[in-house]
Amino acid sequence: MSRVAKKPIDLGKVELNVQNDNVTAKGPKGTLSLAKPAGIAINVENGVATLSTESVDLIPLTGTVRAILSNMVKGVSEGFERKLELVGVGYRAAMQGKDLSLSLGFSHPIVFVAPEGITITTPTQTEILVQGADKQVVGEVAAKIRAFRKPEPYKGKGVKYSDEVIIRKEAKKA
């Protein structure tokens, strides 16, 4: 097995239920489930989960399942968040109920409806915070918001991740 698959998952206060080909993680931030591939065994003992397989063909998949399970456990206990910044004159974000309203230089504001299980907040007019238990969905929502106006390389205007570094280009010289 891979090094990732051999590493045990510390559950902490998370309750992990394995029933047939379905794994459910329940914690303070919510509940997540995963359809487990047949042939991969998940053993839960003393607050630690380990994975094993008999099939040589499933060895690479075991590491992937372990990483997804680890993210599920972290998500339902701590949660995940992604921070976005709006750079540009007149670029603003505001919450209208549960919907996010973005003014990004278009002729109309963009209204983004958050999917189930995702919380979007705006600490300031130029910051957006996407939070949730499912790492994949949090990243997907943040990418969709960023796609409305990607940062451009000349002035750096647009929606960017807070930790993203935009490589700048020099303007054309006459």
Swiss-Prot record:
Keyword DNA-binding annotated: no
Pfam family, one: Ribosomal_L6
Source organism, top-level taxon: Bacteria
Gene Ontology CC terms: cytosolic large ribosomal subunit
Swiss-Prot/TrEMBL keywords: Ribonucleoprotein, Ribosomal protein, RNA-binding, rRNA-binding
GO biological process annotation, one example: cytoplasmic translation
GO molecular function, one term: rRNA binding
Summary of the function given for this chain in its UniProt record: This protein binds to the 23S rRNA, and is important in its secondary structure. It is located near the subunit interface in the base of the L7/L12 stalk, and near the tRNA binding site of the peptidyltransferase center.
Family: Belongs to the universal ribosomal protein uL6 family.
PANTHER family, per database record: 60S/50S RIBOSOMAL PROTEIN L6/L9, LARGE RIBOSOMAL SUBUNIT PROTEIN UL6M
Subunit structure: Part of the 50S ribosomal subunit.
The protein, known as: Large ribosomal subunit protein uL6
